[in-house]
A protein has these predicted regions:
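A short secondary-structure junction motif
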Residues: 23-28, 62
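Short acidic, hydrophobic short linear motifs in intrinsically disordered regions
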Residues: 27-44
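Amphipathic alpha-helical dimerization/coiled-coil segments
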Residues: 2-4, 8, 87-107
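A short, conserved structural fragment
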Residues: 60-71
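Alpha-helix N-cap/helix-initiation sites
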Residues: 9-10, 29-34, 49, 53
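Short amphipathic alpha-helical interaction segments
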Residues: 46-62, 76-79
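Short, cationic-aromatic polyanion-contact patches
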Residues: 10-13, 70-94
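Short alpha-helical segments that sit at the start of domains
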Residues: 1-23
């Protein structure tokens, strides 16, 4: 009996890029939801908030994401947010077929 091995999870970069793709409708908006802030990305991607910046740094250097300071809906202070660049959109869309075929173990 041959079973396809399950991966425990996707890479952090893939999780972050997928999350930003899901929230791409907020790109270039002045007021956004907390989904594209450090706490929002951390919650969605299963990361600790301090690790979000560390996870984003390499994909920021590769030009897949851009960093902005924006007003968050329902909050008084502005926060750092991230969004996909055109290169990042192309990259994650190219990765989608292999991600969709990946069996992932959900705990």
């Amino acid at each position: 009996m041959s079973e396809t091995p399950l991966r425990v999870s996707l890479s952090v970069n893939d999780r972050v890029l997928l999350h930003l793709l899901e929230n791409d409708h907020q790109a270039d908006h002045f007021i956004v939801t907390s989904a594209i802030t450090r706490p929002g990305i951390a919650e969605s991607c299963g990361l600790h908030p301090p690790n979000v910046s560390r996870a984003i740094r390499p994909i920021l250097k590769q030009g897949f994401v851009s960093e902005h300071t924006r007003q968050i809906r329902g909050e008084t202070r502005r926060q750092k947010t991230w969004q996909l660049t055109p290169l990042g959109r192309e990259e994650i869309k190219n990765r989608l077929p292999s991600i969709k075929e990946t069996n992932i173990l959900i705990r």
